[in-house]
Amino acid sequence: MYPKDKKTYEKLMDCAEKIFAEKGYDKASVREITSAANVNLASIHYHFGSKENLLQELLNRKLEWLNQQRLVALKNLESKSKNKPLKPSQILEAFFGTLLDMLDEKNYGGEMFLRLLGRSTLEPNCLISSISSGKNNAVTEKFRDALFKALPNVPKNEIVWRFHFMVGATSY
């Protein structure tokens, strides 16, 4: 979505991220977000159409960046390996290390976004789950495929469950 007024758009995104992380999506109100951003109450509707679209835009922007970092890390490892299977630890570092790297991204608001992701896992919301699943599925699949190659003697369903457990554990 292209912002109509970049300054107001960014203020809304920043305040919404903070409030969603602190209170959760369901308990955050449009009035509270616009008040924190010090903008007109109608600003969310003007820029995003709805609170739901605001959340979607926020998650899309952050997840696209995070997943791009993950794919770059995996691609770099694969190009260095010269078609040999990667070590499982390398694959996991590429996937989960990007989350830790995001904490250092002060200009990208990594810490607040990770709090939002953690909160969304603790307080499941169908909307948040569907947005993040849609953005993460293709990336997660690439990492699982890399783990399948790295661990050919481990049943695929066991790898899938272990990976799923690790993803869940990062939220707690």
Task: Describe the role of every protein-language-model region.
Residues Y9-D14, F48-L71, K75, P85:
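An amphipathic alpha-helix adjacent to DNA-recognition modules
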Residues Q90, Y108-M112, N125-L151:
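Amphipathic alpha-helical packing segments from all-alpha helical-bundle domains
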Residues M112-L122, K156-Y172:
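Hydrophobic alpha-helical segments that form the core
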Residues M1-K7, E78:
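N-terminal intrinsically disordered/low-complexity leader segments
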Residues V72-E111:
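Hydrophobic alpha-helical connector segments
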Residues K11, I19, K23-R61:
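Helix-turn-helix
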